[in-house]
Amino acid sequence: MLAQERDSLPGVSLGLVYENQPQPALAIQPFTGRFGGADLVDDVEVIVGRDLRNSDRFEVMDSIPAGLVGDVVDYTLWDRLGAVWLITGQVEGAGEGYILILELHDVVYGQSVERGRFRIPDGTDPDFRMAVHRASDEIVTWATGDPGMAASRIVFTMTDNQGNKDLYVIDSDGEN
């Protein structure tokens, strides 16, 4: 539930305009962590979930409590809940950083279709969020064949009361 609460923080919202098509339901099974990765699981899951919602390519389903899912993907359960795609994730400690393991499952056919391992730095590293955004973009590519936009940055200027202009760079989700 902490991940859902943090995902609802106000921020920048981006919209895309393209041909209206039905969006497949995508579920995110609660991520797990091991070998020290448990400390980052909530942050990573929140970023991935927000990125997939902002991609506007899926109808991202609300998460279900971790206690209702096991270590093995229950395709029947996810199918009953209406999911077409399912993302599973695990964060593992690896030396100086972490490995994020993401897997895309086709719930309709009951099989894993893509799996990737992504190196991510510690959560205090300035590149942490961008590394997770790049992993999220891979999920979009796996499911749609089109690149994701989460690893994009937005640059803008603001003028203060004295007429000075400041340049700002933020992630596509409004952070940083």
What are these regions (language model features)?
Residues A3-E5:
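Boundary at the C-terminal end of the N-terminal hydrophobic targeting segment
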Residues D7-L77, V91:
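Short beta-strand->alpha-helix linker/helix-N-cap micro-motif
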Residues D71-E138:
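Amphipathic beta-strand/beta-sheet edge segments enriched in Tyr/Trp
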Residues T88, R153-M158, V169:
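Residue position within the beta-strands of beta-propeller blades
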Residues G95-I99, Q162-V169:
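Structural motif
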Residues H133-A151:
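Structural signature of eukaryotic scaffold interfaces centered on beta-propeller domains
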Residues I170-N176:
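Multi-bladed beta-propeller domains
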